[in-house]
Curated annotation (Swiss-Prot):
Catalytic residues as annotated in Swiss-Prot or TrEMBL: 95 (nucleophile)
Domain of life from the UniProt record: Archaea
Coiled coil: none
Protein's name in the database: tRNA-guanine(15) transglycosylase
Catalytic activity line of the entry: guanosine(15) in tRNA + 7-cyano-7-deazaguanine = 7-cyano-7-carbaguanosine(15) in tRNA + guanine
GO biological process, one term: tRNA wobble guanine modification
Annotated GO CC locations: cytoplasm
Residues binding substrate, per UniProt: 130, 196
UniProt xrefs under PROSITE patterns: PUA (PS50890)
Pathway in which the depicted protein is active: tRNA modification; archaeosine-tRNA biosynthesis
């Protein structure tokens, strides 16, 4: 598996669920994901690209086929370039005409012609001419059209000179989506849109969208951004981001405005139904619904489009903040109540535990709130219950927890058991100085797996002024610290050495190449491109052991990626090193 193309760089900066805040760089232009691309129709602009740029939209999408087919637009684009023609300095992505192909059945351009045209007009991100098979198409049709898409992908790979989308197709057949994702992952592309879902979104078949996205994500390499083609309503953003979607596009902001429809994060309302605007954007702060209704159609459409854009932008920000706070699942739960079909999709997503758990952070900034029955099925809850089973058997002394059931009291100080809220209180008893070591040993087994407690069995535990376990030492040397915020262990270098001795390879290891070795020894962060191998069991924010190819300990630190991600990612940090051996 190649490590991707240097024309586009993508790295993860923060995460929750399978969602991630990323930094995407194309041609020296940087944006933060999740991001939304307003769709710009070059023949009919409701909002000018320059105004979109002023509003803070750093990426837009337009249709290269529409430009290609229109003689005047084609001449302008070839003469001026796409950025000057649209008067827009941000990242410009283009579609290839696939949507027109799905809508009208045929288009008058070949795959090679549209790719070469995209090169010539200077787009930042291109798209080859895939075939978007509609939902519920006969399997024979889906297979045949997918093979044509893959053939065109091979042609695009040979001639592409710019970062390019490789769209995952396959209708509603999840095995075909996985097959397409595996094949395209092995090729030299930069972004993977998931296509053919607009009819599903329009008919509120969100459950099918979940199955399609998860099937695709399971087979895609995790270092490439994923774009959910045609998903532009804020009602789906939280759910889609929780699945690992990074990019969205919206034509609906303008289409809805033309139909006098007003977007909210919970759905869409007709303008004539509104007495008040439940929003404080510049449009809604200035006008009343009555004033908008009395305006000429063109002016009203433009103002509604601006409102819709502000709502879209606000919801993307809300999703990002939820990721930062470790509250993404809570937002998904809240948004799922907006529509029964969305609620069904949310419940379906929670069935994909194996996929979700790999990316679920091991610890979070916010406490876990039981806000619904579904919150008991969140990945963080299921994982904690599974891990606690062996601790319960070995350490015993079970107490009743309102979320997790019967749990060993020696886990009662640790995330998420202590940092959680339900209808009933969970009483945390402070340990005595004598049994504090049992807490540390139980935490070690929970955090690092079977056998990890042996690294601490002769240690002494110092209590804080509040009576909580804090420093773990042997002969005055610090092995670890029990963190005050989440009750998990941060390793000192002496503790890392002991853990390295008792845990079999490759448990909790991140293996780096010779180039990175001297930097890791000195306590410098480990970047993903230097990682040769990592324990597949490593989860984001785990405490890990950094080693060389001979399994010699170099450093200890906090994983920022899952083990599988570390091996594949080309950009960004893999481990925030806390201490090197030197």
């Amino acid at each position: 598996m190649s490590r991707g193309d240097k024309m586009l760089k993508f790295e993860i900066k923060a995460r929750d669920g399978a969602g991630r805040i990323g930094k995407l760089e194309v041609n020296g232009k940087k944006i933060e994901t999740p991001a939304i691309m307003p769709v710009v129709n070059p023949k009919q602009m409701v909002v000018e690209p320059k105004e979109l740029e002023k509003m803070g939209f750093e990426i837009i999408i337009t249709n290269s086929y529409i430009i290609y087919k229109d003689e005047e637009l084609r001449r302008k684009a070839l003469e001026l370039g796409i950025h000057r023609m649209l008067d827009y300095n941000g990242i410009i992505e283009v579609d290839s005409g696939s949507f027109q192909l799905m809508k009208y059945g045929s288009i008058e351009v070949s795959n090679r012609e549209i790719i070469e045209f995209q090169h010539r007009i200077g787009v930042d991100i291109g798209t080859f001419l895939d075939i978007p098979t509609p939902p519920d198409a006969p399997r024979e049709q889906a297979v045949k059209e997918l093979e044509i898409t893959l053939s065109r992908a091979r042609e695009a790979e040979e001639i592409k000179e710019i970062p390019m989308n490789a769209t995952i197709q396959g209708s509603t057949y999840t095995d075909l989506r996985r097959y397409a994702a595996r094949r395209l992952s092995s090729m030299n592309f930069e972004i993977h849109p998931i296509g053919g879902v607009v009819p599903l979104l329009e008919s509120y078949r969100f459950r099918d969208v979940v199955d399609i996205v998860i099937s695709s994500k399971m087979a895609l390499r995790p270092d490439r951004p994923v774009h959910l083609f045609g998903a532009g309503h804020p009602i789906v953003f939280a759910l889609a981001v929780a699945m690992g979607v990074d990019l969205f596009d919206s034509a609906s902001y303008a289409l809805y405005a033309k139909d006098d429809r007003y977007m909210t994060p919970e759905g869409t309302k007709r303008l004539d139904e509104l007495d008040y605007f439940p929003c404080s954007c510049p449009v809604c702060s200035k006008y009343t619904p009555q004033e908008l209704r009395e305006m000429p159609k063109e002016e009203r459409t433009r103002l509604l489009a601006l409102h819709n854009l502000w709502v879209i932008k606000e919801e993307i920000k809300r999703v990002k903040q939820a990721i930062k706070e470790g509250e993404l699942w809570r937002l998904v739960d809240e948004r799922a109540r907006s529509h029964p079909k969305l609620y069904s999709a949310y419940k379906r997503l929670l069935e994909h535990y194996t996929f979700l758990e790999e990316f679920e952070p091991i610890t979070k900034k916010s406490a876990l709130f039981k806000i619904s029955n579904e919150s008991l099925r969140w990945p963080v809850v299921r994982r904690a219950k599974e891990r606690a089973k062996s601790i319960n058997e070995r350490f015993g002394e079970l107490v009743e927890h309102p979320i997790f059931g019967r749990v060993s009291r020696y886990l009662s100080l640790t995330y998420p058991f202590a940092q959680s809220e339900a209808e009933d209180d969970f009483k945390i008893e402070k340990p005595t100085k004598e049994d504090a070591i049992k807490y540390v040993m139980a935490i070690a087994e929970y955090q690092f797996g079977e056998g990890a407690s042996r690294a601490f069995d002769d240690a002494k535990v110092e209590l804080s002024k509040t009576g909580m376990p804090r420093q773990v030492k042997v002969n005055g040397k610090r092995l670890a610290t029990v963190r005050a915020d989440d009750g998990l262990l941060t390793l000192g270098i002496e503790g890392a050495k002991r853990l390295h001795r008792v845990l079999p390879y490759p448990r909790m290891r991140v293996v780096v190449n010779k180039e990175a070795e001297p930097f890791a020894r000195k306590g410098k962060d480990v970047f993903a491109k230097f990682v040769i191998f990592a324990d597949p069991g490593i989860r984001p924010y785990d405490e890990v052991l950094v080693v060389n190819e001979n399994d010699e300990l170099l450093a200890t630190g906090q994983a920022l990626l899952s083990g599988r991600e570390m091996i594949v990612f080309q950009y960004g940090r893999a481990v925030k090193v806390r201490k090197g051996v030197e």
